[in-house]
């Protein structure tokens, strides 16, 4: 039997060699650019599919049976080329093939859904694709301006949200992962995105997945991912330069106008654009300017690219400025003499220097473009990263290996763009007469003593009403014109300067506190020395390995592991935080009958911070384990030509960032306070969708309809209030606040993150994307979408029952109302993007409409009548900017 087996094998091999002595070889090129196509497939059918793929130079060589055969040249994103060929015995034929890029929108190539290239029509989840041309037509100053035009995608205070998955995150803890070429761009410390880090000058394509994607991309992909793919060099050198300038329009209401022609001459802007001192020197309103320069080319076996970006924005809101300098590039070496195998390695590098300011509470209803003294914040940041990589592909056995690494360093510090108002300015705004202000400025503080007596009497007696009556009785004549904004200035000033010690002596026996005069002198004429800069430093070390195997039957697996170590040196906390994240993932994909695509995957992750070794702890069959597993599955079935139905289910999670859980941070007067008791967010997303391509006359595009359901457990939200600066606990009693003040202890205004037990978000998204071709030079591009969401707070009834018993003003409620909806989310949104292109001229418009915000933080409530009928007011009775 053994001899028979060997004989049979030898006969098969001999027969194979005799029948396949004929050779076809050549190159495969892009028909438009003449670039070689790497990895293009050349196949024919004979006892199953037979074939090869092209190498790094686009070369292919295939053995064929004698006689006639139909060859198919295929490449993802390109139209197939069918080539019938007749070849004689032992003949060698050379043929070059030119392939055209597919113009069908559903044939677009994406990689984010499965970490490998596939057609958009085959993915099992909702995905939007934005090409470089779409971005260029909108001329954005950063990529977030383009993303906010997509249906189902919102950018709230710079943080992305998919289908209501996030509200207002206060600058930390994004629930959507943002990637550049598969590498995270989220700040390792805060979990937030700084859009200035994205190399807009070199973006090739943006892929947006709406729904949990933690199996392949880990924590922060709870709500979805945004993968920004950069352009790669080709044989033809390419240089791109763009320059732009803009002028902000006047405020709709004249009293909102905060700038004038002399503003820049008096150095009242935090930044100064180049054109401000020349061409635009006479412009009253704020301006912005910028330019991009990029170059890429192939030199021998090297791919080289580089880019630079400068941008300066005075901001349409006072102190809402932005100034950035970004420089980066990449170097890739393609190993020659590898035959059909592919080996390349290199690195990407990027440096960013950034200064920007922002605020989230306006000064007053009539000064909506000016910051409240509580949120007077700016940031100075410098970061650098280098990402080495190595890729190996063996088409002969259908395997690939990819290794990516990163070293990241950042240094940043919070600054106040402007000094707080002085006490003399505050008194002047509040209507205090000139003589009193002059006396105070000259060192005569006697007019303030009655006020301190009134305040102190109430504080010492522990009676809030007495304290407030003391204030208004004693200061009624001093502050005749005081507004709420003026009192905010006064409170902010008091928080910065504190109160004198031994205040009870002034109340009880009329004796002045020993430090009263020095204290008043200091606050009236404060030292102008700049405060010591407290620079936080962040180090990140990252390593990712991925293995992929494909079989001829249409099956493939993707598996790998990641490791990340973060070191954060906090200047404010005077402490070093270290975290480790280790994960392994596996995904199986199968194509059946050339119609059905099935995908399933699993990931497990371990996470620790300092000595907290069980940050990812979970229960499996009742047993606690220090790691967290998550699963996903999906399918896509082609019903007919250009008709696809899909269904997916995915679990997700997000570990609280170091900033959310461990750090104390001042942000322009308002603080972020740590909470060691918050747990990771967990959740899942389920979706059923239908995609239909169409070509009606000159219209070509597709319609997509998706129903979705998302559930979160331990969802992290923040809550405003007063906090003890010593132990970071929330102050829930006026009596406790008074006692702290009388004891000389300070408290602060701020936010703290905590878990909301359960949230449910469900709804429907309907969109269409396409182009109308008038002729070869004239086109109309369009993208329209409507999203309905129902963002439910599943525990609102239990919370209302507890909050209904609150009697103290400092017992801060969760939301602005007792309804069932989550904060900072609308129910309805509609977006439309239309671009008309004639040759190289583009004219377009973006339109967005949203229904009212359903709830906000309780602290933002203001029951007073609205000051202006045209004032943007998200919910009736709420003054929030």
Set out the residue ranges of the language-model regions.
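Short, acidic, small-residue-rich periplasmic hinge/interaction motif at the N-terminus
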Residues: 29-33, 38-45, 74-78, 88, ...
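Extracytoplasmic beta-strand/coil segments of soluble accessory domains associated
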Residues: 61, 127, 144-183, 187
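Short acidic/polar hinge/loop motifs at secondary-structure boundaries
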Residues: 61-63, 183-210, 229-231
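Surface-exposed extracellular loop regions of Gram-negative outer-membrane beta-barrel proteins
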Residues: 291-330, 356-363, 404, 409-419, ...
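Flexible loop and strand-edge segments within Gram-negative outer membrane beta-barrel domains
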Residues: 313-328, 332-397, 407-427, 530-539, ...
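Membrane-embedded beta-barrel scaffold of Gram-negative outer-membrane proteins
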Residues: 402-406, 410-414, 638, 644-648, ...
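Structural signature of Gram-negative outer-membrane beta-barrels, strongest in the C-terminal barrel
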Residues: 550-566, 570-710
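Gram-negative outer-membrane beta-barrel transporters
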Residues: 708-711, 730-859
């Amino acid at each position: 039997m053994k001899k028979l087996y060997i004989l049979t094998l030898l006969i098969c091999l001999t027969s194979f060699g005799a029948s396949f002595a004929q050779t076809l070889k050549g190159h495969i090129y892009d028909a438009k650019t003449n670039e070689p196509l790497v990895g293009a497939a050349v196949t024919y059918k004979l006892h199953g599919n037979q074939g090869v793929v092209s190498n790094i130079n686009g070369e292919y060589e295939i053995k064929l049976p004698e006689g006639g055969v139909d060859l198919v040249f295929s490449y993802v994103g390109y139209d197939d080329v069918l080539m019938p060929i007749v070849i004689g015995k032992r003949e060698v034929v050379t043929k070059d093939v030119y392939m055209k890029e597919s113009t069908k929108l559903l044939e677009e190539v994406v990689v984010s859904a499965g970490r490998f290239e596939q057609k958009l029509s085959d993915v099992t989840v909702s995905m939007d694709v934005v090409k470089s041309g779409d971005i260029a037509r909108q001329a954005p100053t950063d990529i977030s301006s383009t993303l906010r035009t997509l249906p189902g995608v919102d950018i709230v205070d710079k943080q992305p949200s998919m289908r209501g998955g996030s509200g207002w995150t206060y600058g930390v803890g994004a629930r959507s992962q943002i990637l550049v070429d598969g590498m995270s761009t989220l700040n390792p410390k805060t979990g937030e995105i700084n859009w200035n880090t994205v190399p807009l000058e070199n973006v090739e394509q943006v892929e947006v997945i709406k729904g949990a994607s933690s199996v392949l991309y880990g924590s922060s992909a709870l709500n979805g991912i945004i993968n920004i793919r950069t352009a790669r060099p080709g044989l033809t050198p390419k240089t791109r330069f763009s320059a732009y300038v803009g002028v902000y329009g006047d405020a709709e209401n004249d009293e909102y106008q905060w700038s004038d022609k002399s503003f820049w001459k008096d150095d009242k802007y935090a930044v100064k654009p180049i054109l401000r001192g020349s061409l635009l020197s006479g412009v009253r309103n704020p301006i912005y300017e910028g330019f991009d320069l990029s170059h890429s080319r192939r030199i021998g076996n090297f791919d080289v690219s580089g880019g630079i970006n400068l941008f300066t924005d005075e901001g349409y809101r006072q102190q809402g400025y932005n100034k950035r300098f970004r420089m980066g590039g990449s170097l890739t070496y393609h190993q020659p003499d590898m035959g059909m195998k592919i080996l390349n390695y290199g690195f990407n590098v990027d440096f960013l220097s950034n200064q920007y300011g922002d605020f989230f509470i306006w000064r007053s209803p009539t000064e909506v473009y000016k910051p409240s003294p509580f949120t007077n914040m700016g940031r100075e940041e410098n970061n650098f990263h280098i990402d080495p990589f190595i890729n190996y592909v063996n088409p002969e056995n259908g395997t690939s290996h990819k290794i990516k690494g990163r070293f990241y360093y950042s240094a940043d510090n919070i600054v106040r763009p402007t000094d707080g108002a002085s006490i003399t300015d505050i008194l002047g705004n509040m209507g205090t007469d000139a003589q009193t202000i002059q006396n105070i400025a000259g060192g005569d503080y006697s007019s303030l003593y009655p006020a301190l007596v009134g305040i102190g009497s109430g504080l010492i007696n522990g009676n809030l009403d007495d304290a407030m009556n003391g204030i208004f009785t004693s200061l009624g004549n001093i502050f005749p014109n005081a507004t709420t904004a003026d009192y905010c200035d006064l409170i902010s000033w008091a928080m910065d300067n504190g109160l004198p010690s031994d205040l009870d002596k002034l109340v009880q026996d009329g004796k002045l506190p020993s430090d009263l005069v020095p204290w008043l002198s200091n606050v009236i004429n404060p030292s102008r020395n700049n405060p010591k800069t407290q620079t936080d430093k962040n180090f990140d070390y990252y390593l990712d390995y991925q293995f992929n195997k494909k079989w001829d039957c249409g099956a493939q697996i993707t598996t790998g592991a990641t490791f990340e170590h973060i070191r954060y040196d906090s200047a404010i906390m005077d402490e070093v935080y270290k975290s480790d994240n280790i994960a392994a993932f596996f995904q199986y994909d199968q194509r059946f009958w050339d119609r059905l695509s099935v995908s399933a995957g699993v990931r497990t992750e371990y996470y620790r911070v300092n000595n907290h070794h069980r940050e990812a702890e979970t229960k499996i069959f009742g047993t606690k384990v220090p790691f967290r597993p998550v699963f996903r599955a999906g399918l896509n079935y082609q019903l007919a030509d250009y008709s696809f139905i899909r269904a997916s289910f995915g679990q997700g999670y997000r570990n609280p960032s170091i900033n959310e859980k461990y750090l104390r941070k001042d942000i322009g007067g308002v603080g972020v306070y740590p909470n060691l008791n918050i747990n990771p967010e967990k959740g899942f997303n389920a979706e059923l969708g239908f995609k239909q391509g169409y070509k009606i006359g000159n219209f070509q595009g597709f319609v997509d309809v998706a129903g979705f359901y998302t559930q979160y457990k331990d969802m992290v939200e923040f809550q405003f209030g007063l906090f003890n600066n010593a132990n970071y606990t929330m102050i829930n009693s006026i009596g406790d606040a008074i006692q702290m003040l009388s004891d000389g202890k300070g408290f602060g205004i701020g936010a703290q993150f905590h878990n909301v037990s359960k949230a449910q978000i469900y709804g429907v998204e309907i969109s269409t994307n396409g182009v109308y071709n008038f002729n070869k030079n004239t086109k109309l591009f369009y993208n329209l979408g409507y999203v309905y969401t129902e963002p439910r707070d599943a525990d609102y009834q239990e919370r209302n029952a507890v909050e209904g018993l609150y009697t103290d003003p400092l017992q801060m409620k969760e939301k602005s109302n007792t309804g069932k909806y989550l904060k900072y989310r609308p129910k309805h949104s509609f977006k439309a993007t239309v671009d008309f292109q004639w040759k190289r001229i583009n004219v377009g418009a973006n339109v967005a409409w949203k229904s009212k915000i359903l709830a906000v933080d309780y602290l933002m409530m203001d029951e007073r009548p609205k000051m202006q009928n045209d004032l943007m007011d998200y919910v009736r009775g709420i003054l929030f900017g």
